[in-house]
Amino acid sequence: MKVILASASQRRQELLIRLCDNFDIIVSDFDEEKVVFENSIDEYVQNIALGKAMDIKEKIKEDAIIISADTIVTLDDKILGKPKDEEDAFNMIKLLQGRSHKVYSGVVVINTKKDLIIKNSVATEVVFSKMNDDEIRKYIKTKEPLDKAGAYGIQGIGGIFVEEIRGCYYNVVGLPLNKLKTMLEEAI
């Protein structure tokens, strides 16, 4: 059966290759702003991922396995998505430096033939080292932080500033492979 990744993320595409060597990419038009945070971060990221997957399900005519994900960073119950601009990235990193935060990914797998929807989420704790303003500005000049939740990429230059990680590394990159593997086995 055809496998579809509902994501424009290059990182998610590179990670999915480890589980599935043949898949199509269809980018969702789902408006993440439609999802309202109520009281559970796990439910919130799962619902965003579900919205993306359902958007693709409505667009395709054939049976397929659809995979979607959403990743956010939280600090002191504050959600940090992708920065709006360099100043926003600076402020996010300034908040994270020298502290522990959590990265949540919601993952959804839909088997359209079975009309089966599997939702899950994974949380990983990350400890950032202390950074001075010059280090933060230098990192932002690389442009790496500008398209990532929490304004850093653990798999890139941002990994230099990670002191410790508790949980799934791939979750922080954007696709928790171990959890996704289990979900795909259940879906097929």
UniProtKB/Swiss-Prot annotation:
The keyword Cytoplasm applies. Its cofactor is a divalent metal cation. The keyword Cytoplasm applies. It is found in: Cytoplasm. GO terms for biological process: nucleotide metabolic process. Disulfide bonds: none annotated. NCBIfam families: maf, PRK00078.1. Belongs to the Maf family. YhdE subfamily. This is dTTP/UTP pyrophosphatase. It comes from Clostridium botulinum (strain Eklund 17B / Type B).
